[in-house]
């Protein structure tokens, strides 16, 4: 199947399904989900149906999207939902007029696979969708969920450049699940409240490139307990792949994270100030080391990326993690860029 295959201002339920029945007037937007029939796409689409900043929800997939649209279209919120198939210019229709485009399309991980193992299949899918999006809705904000994000976001950039419409502020790699896992897993170790723990996660979105900055979240752990927590955050997806025994990867938690990132982007587009997420964007932070993309805290605005925040003060342990991450990131980014070059 084509489908499977985003801190401080975040209140989980309200952020994803804010005031679904509110009579308060506010600007709403068209959101397109590419890969809406898959394991992530279906629950992601449902969560977006609950968001009062979505006026129109366009669902596309090579199969199943009209059925998903018919199903979630019964949910009693005001947004209109339409599902599109590839025939009769379905992709173009889904993208036409979209303010935000979310891409969870691609194949899922199976036991023993890393995110990077998905490159061979997912790279071409993301490239082709980027071409279509760039030609149809060049001013949209693009949220790439498809793994390996460290490579697919550079692919998306290169494709947009080919079309002549790339705007760095408009392109996001969705790494929100790393932040979600960091707060949840840390709360299990510290007995704190997950929703009150804000752990910045920088770097990338694959294994050792995921660098949780526990020190910035006020978490003081050392030794084996710290190492185990860091490893679990970095490789938490493996738990789900193993538990599902070949039947899929982290689809539901990823849908939640994707909906959170989309909600943050929509809130910023609507004019809300101070909206922040950790996200993988074209960044100046490590360009002097040849690394054009990096995940860090980003303040969102009406034009997408507003402010890219530096990593900030970190301890020696985190510095060592970051050094490893940068080396891996450079290789993954280059791999993606060369795919379209």
Curated annotation (Swiss-Prot):
GO terms for biological process?
Answer: carboxylic acid metabolic process; tricarboxylic acid cycle
Assembly and interaction partners: Homodimer.
Q: Which E.C. number(s) belong to this protein?
A: 1.1.1.37
Q: What is the lineage of its organism?
A: Eukaryota, Fungi, Dikarya, Ascomycota, Taphrinomycotina
Q: Which gene encodes it?
A: MDH1
**Which reaction is recorded as catalysed by this protein?**
(S)-malate + NAD(+) = oxaloacetate + NADH + H(+)
Give this protein's Gene Ontology molecular function annotations.
Answer: L-malate dehydrogenase (NAD+) activity
Q: What class of enzyme is it?
A: oxidoreductase
Q: What is this protein identified as? A: Malate dehydrogenase, mitochondrial
- Organism encoding this protein: Schizosaccharomyces pombe (strain 972 / ATCC 24843)
């Amino acid at each position: 199947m084509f489908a499977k295959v985003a801190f401080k201002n975040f209140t989980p339920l309200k952020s994803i399904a804010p005031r679904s029945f509110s009579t308060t007037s506010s600007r709403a937007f068209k959101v397109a989900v590419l890969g809406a029939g898959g394991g992530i796409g279906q629950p992601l689409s449902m969560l977006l149906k609950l968001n009062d900043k979505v006026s129109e929800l366009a669902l596309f997939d090579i199969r199943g999207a009209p059925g998903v649209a018919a199903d979630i279209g019964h949910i009693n919120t005001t947004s209109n939902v339409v599902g599109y198939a590839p025939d009769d210019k379905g992709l173009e229709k889904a993208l036409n007029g979209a303010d935000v485009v979310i891409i969870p399309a691609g194949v899922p991980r199976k036991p023993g696979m890393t995110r990077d193992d998905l490159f061979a299949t997912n790279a071409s899918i993301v490239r082709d969708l980027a071409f279509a999006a760039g030609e149809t809705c060049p001013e949209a904000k693009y949220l790439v969920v498809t793994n390996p994000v460290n490579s697919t976001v550079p692919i998306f950039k290169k494709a947009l450049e080919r079309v002549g419409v790339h705007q760095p502020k408009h392109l996001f790699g969705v790494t929100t699940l790393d932040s979600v896992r960091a707060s949840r897993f840390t709360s299990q170790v510290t007995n704190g409240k997950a929703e009150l723990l804000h752990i910045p996660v920088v770097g990338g979105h694959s294994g050792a490139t995921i660098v949780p900055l526990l020190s910035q979240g006020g978490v003081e752990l050392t030794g084996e307990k710290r190492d185990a927590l860091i490893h679990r955050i970095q490789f938490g997806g493996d738990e789900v792949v193993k538990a599902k025994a070949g039947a899929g990867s982290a689809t539901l938690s990823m849908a939640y994270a994707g909906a959170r990132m989309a909600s943050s982007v929509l809130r910023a587009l609507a004019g809300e100030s101070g909206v922040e997420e950790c996200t993988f964007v074209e960044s100046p932070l490590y360009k002097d080391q040849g690394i054009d993309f990096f995940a860090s805290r980003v303040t969102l605005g009406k034009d997408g990326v507003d402010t890219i925040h530096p990593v900030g003060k970190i301890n020696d342990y985190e510095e060592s993690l970051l050094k490893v991450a940068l080396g891996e990131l450079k290789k993954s980014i280059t791999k993606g860029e060369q795919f379209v070059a």
